[in-house]
Amino acid sequence: MKKLLIISLCIAACNSQPVKRYGMITGLKPEKIVEYKQLHTAAWPGVLRKISEVNIRNYSIYLKKIDDKYYLFSYFEYTGNNFDADMKKMAADSTTQRWWSITAPMQIPLPEAVVEKQTWTSMEEVFHY
């Protein structure tokens, strides 16, 4: 029984992918807060499926008001081997494209994201425990 347990643990450990954590930020138009929350309360199954297919897990989005502006902070973990290729797969997905065509106009990209023609800006991880 001990050998079986050890082998099972080894298989689980050997097959696990390294996890890379991502934090991203963007602005949110105040008049779109309710609609944005409603959309995410009933996120489309096809969008959620694609998120899983491209090796993203533990995906969360938070809302914070700072002064008179609203910001979205997202956190997710990536377990794949080629982030750029997986993000291209997500961007090529027609359901995801439709979702983004609704959500992107609600958001206010930070200046850095505008230059890069993106909506979300990556954040630097400064601590993890």
Language-model segments: residues:
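Sec-dependent signal peptide recognition
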Residues: 1-7
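Terminal, regulation- and interaction-focused segments at domain boundaries
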Residues: 19-33
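Short amphipathic alpha-helical segments
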Residues: 32-57
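An amphipathic, aromatic/His-enriched active-site/gating alpha helix that lines ligand/cofactor pockets
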Residues: 50-57, 77-119
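Short beta-strand micro-motifs enriched in acidic
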Residues: 62-66
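A generic structural motif
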Residues: 70-74
